[in-house]
Regions:
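Condensing-enzyme catalytic core mediating Claisen C-C bond formation in acyl metabolism
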Residues: 1-61, 173, 178-219
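Beta-strand segments within the central parallel beta-sheet cores of soluble alpha/beta enzyme folds
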Residues: 5, 46, 84-91, 126-130, ...
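Short acidic, glycine/serine/threonine-rich loops at helix termini
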Residues: 16-17, 101-103, 142-143, 168-173
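Buried hydrophobic packing segments
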Residues: 68-75, 141-148, 188
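Phosphate/pyrophosphate-binding loops at sites that engage ATP/ADP/AMP, CoA/4′-phosphopantetheine
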Residues: 71-87
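Acidic, glycine-rich active-site loops and adjacent beta-strand->loop/helix elements
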Residues: 92-98, 132-137, 161-166, 203-205
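Flexible, glycine-rich active-site loops centered on histidine and acidic residues
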Residues: 150-183
């Protein structure tokens, strides 16, 4: 059985944050010392290197699962299918739902379950689970959806990637200007004569690399 992406959807938040919004930030070096350059110079260099002049942040009342729900609605509409026809909802993220003003991630119930609830899916056989896999989480979700379909365990999967990184970055880190919020989703279906994933390669490096990324201390 071949597969096809039959629908896609995204949600781009409305809150526009230009580079000039960072001019009053107190950026620090990794040792806690203040940069010698002015924020104006730092921001100009940042734009020259990255090409980024603005980014989008989620509204205060929305969390990652809300953005994912909006993107999923668009994907289902694009695919012209009912949410009740889904066999799996695979939601790739890293930090869960982080409420505005907090840095604490909330992952219970799973964000995929929250999306299923928002979509008002009654079918208990629609399995919803989260995938924490770093930056390539959505790609790994696609690989898993492909495996489910090829094995005959599923015919239709909803694969989502969403994050509200604006709520977990260090405000004193100049690299915080890189990150933004948003969501993307797609419907993957079994389809005769469609396509295949020709190759894929996943890996986890967990020796000295295991704690390159970590949560900071709580106070």
């Amino acid at each position: 059985m071949s597969i096809a992406i039959t629908g896609t959807g995204c949600y781009i938040p409305e809150v526009l944050v230009p580079n000039k919004a960072f001019e009053d930030k107190h950026f620090l070096n990794s040792d806690g010392s203040t940069f010698q350059q002015s924020n104006t110079v730092i921001i100009e260099k940042f734009k020259a290197i990255t090409g980024i002049s603005e980014r989008r942040y989620a509204k205060k009342e929305y969390n990652a699962s809300d953005l994912a729900f909006f993107a999923s609605q668009n994907a289902l509409e694009d695919a012209n299918i009912s949410a009740e026809d889904l066999d799996y909802i695979i939601f790739a993220h890293n930090f869960g739902d982080v409420s505005y003003g907090s840095s604490q991630g909330n992952t219970l119930p799973s964000l995929a379950t929250r999306v299923k609830n928002h979509l008002q899916i009654k079918n208990p056989k629609c399995v919803a689970y989260d995938l924490l896999f770093g930056c390539p989480g959505w790609i790994e979700g696609m690989i898993q959806a492909y495996a489910f379909i090829k094995s005959g365990m599923a015919r239709r999967c909803l694969v989502i990637g969403a994050e509200t990184l604006s709520r977990v970055v260090d405000p004193h880190d100049r690299d915080s200007m890189i990150y933004s919020d948003g969501a993307g989703a797609c419907i993957v279906e079994a389809k005769e004569g469609a396509g295949e994933i020709l190759a894929h390669n996943s890996a986890t490096y967990a020796n000295e690399e295991a704690y390159y990324l970590f949560h900071g201390s709580s106070y």
